[in-house]
């Protein structure tokens, strides 16, 4: 299967494209965002990596500027290293991730990447004989380590890194202040927020949600482009964040701890910590 078959995209205007993996039919299917700038293009999250995303972008003509001068530099940023977001980083020359998860990416740690994929989720295998049990996130050396407050410049567009741990220890959002757009990764999406994985932390998540609410209160976000499911606006962002905070009491922390223990055992059985096998 070619990259052109595996991926599909939808233009959203203002140089932003929404890309998905067509034959990965799962709640874990991550949204991939392409943001085009005057000097650099940016991919936010990279999917599973079963087919080359850069090949798709080139074949679909998404990297060629209007003047036909040739492709601009391309940077791939992972909002966190979970497998559905980081598997495709292997196909990029320039890769950025938050420093808290850089070591996991470098060693191909499929425990921290929470790699969990089944044959039934991949409705059309990328090649004959492919099996989900052979899938892993390979080691990738990041070319840039991100920190809170870093700015990724695309020339005519600036994206500010917000370190928002909770879902994972290195989770980030990218904030386009000028256009009031938040690329939220898995920090928040229109669904149940997951805080029971290895390296999740409820207390950190509460603080991150408070920051999300502050963005809305200050009028700094109008549109959220999340890591999963559909886009939504500021009012929904505020409600999702406030709802999480309201439920994050002692009972929730206890139940989350139990779920994390179960998830950790399951992930240890399917993935060797610190390896990509």
UniProtKB/Swiss-Prot annotation:
Compartment(s) where it occurs, according to its Swiss-Prot or TrEMBL record: Endoplasmic reticulum membrane; Cell membrane
Source taxon at top rank: Eukaryota
EC number: 3.1.2.2, 3.5.2.6
UniProt keyword Lyase present: no
Signal peptide residues on this chain, from the entry's feature table: none
Membrane topology designation: Lipid-anchor
Residues given in the record as Zn(2+) 2 binding sites: 84-85, 186, 228
Gene3D superfamilies (alphabetical): Ribonuclease Z/Hydroxyacylglutathione hydrolase-like
Binding residue positions for Zn(2+) 1: 80, 82, 167, 186
Entry-linked Pfam families: Lactamase_B
One annotated GO molecular function: beta-lactamase activity
Listed CDD domains: MBLAC2-like_MBL-fold
Cofactor list: Zn(2+)
Enzyme superclass (EC): hydrolase
Predominant location category: endoplasmic reticulum
Function noted in UniProt: Acyl-CoA thioesterases are a group of enzymes that catalyze the hydrolysis of acyl-CoAs to the free fatty acid and coenzyme A (CoASH), providing the potential to regulate intracellular levels of acyl-CoAs, free fatty acids and CoASH. Has an acyl-CoA thioesterase activity towards the long chain fatty acyl-CoA thioester palmitoyl-CoA (hexadecanoyl-CoA; C16:0-CoA). Displays a substrate preference for fatty acyl-CoAs with chain-lengths C12-C18.
Family indicated by similarity: Belongs to the metallo-beta-lactamase superfamily. Glyoxalase II family.
Name of the protein in question: Acyl-coenzyme A thioesterase MBLAC2
Protein's organism: Gallus gallus (Chicken)
Primary gene name: MBLAC2
């Amino acid at each position: 299967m070619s990259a052109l078959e595996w991926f599909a995209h939808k233009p959203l205007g203002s140089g932003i494209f929404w890309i998905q993996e067509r034959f990965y039919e799962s709640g874990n299917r991550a949204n991939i965002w392409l943001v085009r700038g005057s000097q650099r293009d940016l991919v936010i999250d990279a999917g599973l990596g079963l087919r080359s995303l850069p090949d798709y972008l080139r074949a679909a003509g998404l990297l060629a500027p209007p003047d036909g001068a040739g492709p601009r530099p391309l940077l791939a940023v992972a909002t966190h290293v979970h497998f559905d977001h980081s598997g495709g980083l292997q196909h990029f020359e320039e890769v950025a991730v938050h420093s808290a998860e850089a070591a996991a990416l470098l060693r191909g740690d499929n425990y921290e990447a929470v790699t969990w994929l089944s044959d039934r989720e991949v409705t059309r295998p990328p090649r004959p004989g492919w099996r989900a049990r052979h899938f892993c996130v390979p080691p990738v050396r990041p070319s840039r380590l991100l920190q809170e407050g870093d700015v990724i410049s695309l020339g005519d567009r600036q994206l500010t890194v917000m370190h928002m741990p909770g879902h994972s220890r290195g989770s980030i959002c990218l904030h386009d202040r000028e256009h009031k757009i938040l690329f939220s990764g898995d920090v928040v999406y229109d669904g149940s927020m997951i805080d029971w994985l290895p390296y999740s932390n409820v207390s950190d998540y509460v603080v991150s949600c408070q920051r999300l609410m502050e963005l809305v209160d200050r009028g700094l976000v109008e549109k959220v482009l999340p890591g999963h499911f559909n886009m939504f606006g500021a009012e929904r962002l505020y409600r999702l964040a406030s709802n999480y905070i309201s439920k994050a009491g002692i009972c929730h922390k206890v139940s989350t701890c139990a779920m994390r223990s179960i998830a950790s055992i399951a992930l240890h059985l399917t993935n060797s910590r610190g390896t990509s096998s």
